[in-house]
Amino acid sequence: MSTGDTVCMGWLIKSPPERKLQRYAWRKRWFVLRRGRMSGNPDVLEYYRNKHSNKPIRVIDLSECTVWKHAGPGFIRKEFQKNFVFIVKTTSRTFYLVAKTEEEMQVWVHSISQVCNFSHLEDGADSMESLSHMPSSFQPSPASSLHTVHVANSALLKDDRNTNSVVTEETRRESEFLFLPDYLILSNCETGRLHHASLPTRCDSWSNSNHSLAQTSFDDVFLDGLQPFISNNLVHPLHHGKVSQDFPSIRPQASLIWNREINGPSRNLMSSSPLLESSLNPTVHVEEKQVSLPSGVKELNIMSNTPPPRPPKPSYLSEQRQDQPLLTGHSSNKKPGYTMVPRRISLSGLDHVGSWKGDVQSQSLRHRDKRLSLNLPCKFSPIYPTASPSAEDSYVPMSPKGTASELRPHCSQDDYIPMSSSMLPELPADLEPPPVNRNLKPQRKSRPPPLDSRNLSTIQEHTSLTRTYTVPCNRTSFLSPQRNGINCARLFSTPSEEEEEEEEEEEEEEEEEKYIQMEEYGTVSSLSRSALSWTKKFSLDYLALDFNSTSPAPVQKKLLLSEEQRVDYVQVDEQKTQALRSTKQEWTDERQSKV
């Protein structure tokens, strides 16, 4: 947020949360009060660790808050009870803030309450006092546009009794006028439209944006039943109303009230149109000293609270013709036409009435062209003949009947050529549509060709590999496989070539050791072992699966071994092996028997 939104800043001592007021320390922080009303940001109270900190410690939202001076001990610590303490209470937390002096506390309380819209009375009185001493061209903000037109709601009669009641009503409304805030809250505003019995009033804007608004905010509206040259009554409106009033350039004047029932329909000023829709519901108070009301004024009605009408539809124009006597308020012998009028007229807007009067004819022609472009029913005939431009070779008339001058309507100032309201020409029966080459479509996507699965390799199932290991035992030895040193767990594994080589080397080493080392075993009767022969077969099946069918099977590389690591395998004679084992067992039995 910019520094221009800063309202007040200074050092304050901040309280901890309410449940920790007595236990936790009160910190001295740099507080900044920011108003975000003009920039669209919320009104906040920020506090920083010091002056030069860029990021605030906390941002307190003042959208729903109350502020007041602290009275009494309450929850305040003893060291701060005699100081200048004020309280800011929000929806989430209550802050006890300690100021250094009473003047600082007054400034903070007044600034926060002003931001939180708690000082409407003082602000309204100050704004009214400053408004009476400042000219209309030096008003500081568009907030003063809130003090625009104020119209009495009671009826004005000719006798003095009712006149006094009107003055009393105006005095009461003047007292209500002091309570208005500096700025207009748009959510409280209402837009309305004058009905046929209401009196249009000319608002005198008192803000410095009046001049620019009067020139740029002329909202064009289609109005039926208006006099083509109604601006003649706008140039000298005061001669018919018998209202004597000057137009000073410095002092802002009240609104000029137009009479609704002044002699003759030609003197009915601006009452023949629902004119001057004001975007603000509050209006300027009419002071009796500044404006002398005409004797023919019967009543002043406040604007209706009905929303603005929707844009007209084609059926709206025919219905408007029937309601024309209601809108105009009097019957006119002249042929009704279409004209354009601004929604609001101010003092600066009257300077442009002359140019606006000259543009009525061209604007009416432009609206006729717009109606033709929308194929709306035309209420008038083309009064102004236009010269038809030279027809181009590529120009195709929209209607088969009529000449080129009738087919080409009047061109407006912005070179807009509307369409003709006539029907389109009929096409010949033998006319065929142009051929369409669908292969030239830019976003057409061809289907991808089907996958060619002929070159893809399939999963080849290999036959199971069966390896049979036979572990024979001598009938005379009756040895268990544990005593023979055969590890059965190795038989169930799936060794590779290197592991098989290592296992065979280890088995040979174990066999050599078992010939030397003599183990002691308990004696078992030879009769019980003679009937046992231990022979088992172990079948191991291997199935090679290749799950990646597209890629070839990986080639297993054999490790190259040196001459020292290479082992030459020989076929083992089973008879010699059994003889060695039986000899070993006999030696063992003899040693055990000697012990």
Swiss-Prot record:
Residues of the PH domain: 5-117
Gene Ontology BP term (one): macrophage differentiation
UniProtKB keywords: Phosphoprotein
GO CC terms: cytosol
Organ and tissue specificity: Highly expressed in spleen and thymus and weakly in brain, heart, lung, kidney, uterus, and embryonic stem cells. Also expressed in myeloid and macrophage cell lines.
Biased composition annotated in UniProt, kind: Polar residues: 317-331, 454-463
Post-translational modification: Phosphorylated on tyrosine residue(s) after macrophage colony-stimulating factor (M-CSF) receptor stimulation.
Stretches for region Disordered: 295-339, 389-408, 418-463, 493-513
Family statement: Belongs to the GAB family.
Subunit structure: Interacts with PIK3R/p85, SHP2 and GRAP2/MONA. May interact with Grb2.
Name recorded for this polypeptide: GRB2-associated-binding protein 3
Provenance organism: Mus musculus (Mouse)
Taxonomic lineage: Eukaryota, Metazoa, Chordata, Craniata, Vertebrata
Gene coding for it: Gab3
